[in-house]
Amino acid sequence: MEERMVSAEAQTEEAAVEQGIRPHSFEQYIGQEKVKQNLKVFIEAAKMREEALDHVLLYGPPGLGKTTLSTIIANELGVQMRTTSGPAIERPGDLAAILTALEPGDVLFIDEIHRLNRMVEEVLYPAMEDYCIDIVIGKGPTARSVRLDLPPFTLVGATTRAGMLSSPLRDRFGVMARLEYYNVEELTTIIERTATIFDTELERDASIEIARRSRGTPRIANRLLRRVRDFAQVSGDMRISSSRAIESLERLQVDRLGLDHIDHKLIKGIMTKFNGGPVGLETISATIGEETDTIEEVYEPYLLQIGFLQRTPRGRVVTPLAYEHFNMEVPNK
């Protein structure tokens, strides 16, 4: 699968860039107002009681700021944050080493927490509930279990697939917050903030053009801004205009709704070869040369979200909205 300009997943070279533009406080964090206001209250209450904040689960689509929020939680609490991920914790001993190194009140951030294996998860239960872990020392008949007390800490888990979390793990989170897609106004503000950090001048209309194509996702917005800035810089533009932004985005093959060439290929393929559907997933896969899992998990969600595609018992169907976007007539069936 090729790397896409409009993918919400973090790309290899983006970690350092994202670190440099990441907000560090709730005041700097744009959007997610309900989540933000609730977290402010929970954090303030925990500080007033001099207790560790309840464990927090942040879930929702990729690229919406779950890692950033976890950093802000630690900053607002005035504690250190230890970062890891579900796939990185392979054995119970790995988790035990992380937990025993925590200081009182610290935040442990586990990204992709749905990918923890079951044995590791079982070590996490008493750690979350009672701030202790049981470890086995020795082997065979001489093996014995030793209980280690842990300092009070806050686990912040992040996942794009909350449904894959086991019930025992999910039930141990005192705070659960779903992050939603951003609107154009919020994304415009984010783009303007990032442009200021990059020392890049751009017109308000240019920010709006980039925001419209960002699929409601800050990560995509910031990526598109960086690429538009490249085009402007090489062209000698001191200030990014709306026309420069539009021209650059067209060269990147990102249309006014954030659809790229793969989206066009998929939708137009169903329109022209199958009269708009219904058509089966396997057939689409053969037509565009992509795996069925990739189509279902990567390409289709946004097309479903904007109402361009429907899943029916008989297969995929392109909607009249999609025909309108591509200036094509809806076929008579």
From Swiss-Prot:
UniProt key word Ribonucleoprotein: no
Residues that hold DNA according to the record: 311, 316
Name of the protein: Holliday junction branch migration complex subunit RuvB
CDD domains in the cross-refs: AAA (cd00009)
UniProt cross-references to NCBIfam families, sorted A to Z: PRK00080.1 (NF000868), ruvB (TIGR00635)
Region (Large ATPase domain (RuvB-L)): 1-182
Assembly: Homohexamer. Forms an RuvA(8)-RuvB(12)-Holliday junction (HJ) complex. HJ DNA is sandwiched between 2 RuvA tetramers; dsDNA enters through RuvA and exits via RuvB. An RuvB hexamer assembles on each DNA strand where it exits the tetramer. Each RuvB hexamer is contacted by two RuvA subunits (via domain III) on 2 adjacent RuvB subunits; this complex drives branch migration. In the full resolvosome a probable DNA-RuvA(4)-RuvB(12)-RuvC(2) complex forms which resolves the HJ.
Region of interest called Small ATPAse domain (RuvB-S), as start-end residue ranges on this chain: 183-253
Residue runs in coiled coils: none
Region (Head domain (RuvB-H)): 256-333
Chain positions recorded as ATP binding sites: 21-22, 63, 66-68, 129-131, 172, 182, 219
Physiological role: The RuvA-RuvB-RuvC complex processes Holliday junction (HJ) DNA during genetic recombination and DNA repair, while the RuvA-RuvB complex plays an important role in the rescue of blocked DNA replication forks via replication fork reversal (RFR). RuvA specifically binds to HJ cruciform DNA, conferring on it an open structure. The RuvB hexamer acts as an ATP-dependent pump, pulling dsDNA into and through the RuvAB complex. RuvB forms 2 homohexamers on either side of HJ DNA bound by 1 or 2 RuvA tetramers; 4 subunits per hexamer contact DNA at a time.
Reaction equation(s) it catalyzes: ATP + H2O = ADP + phosphate + H(+)
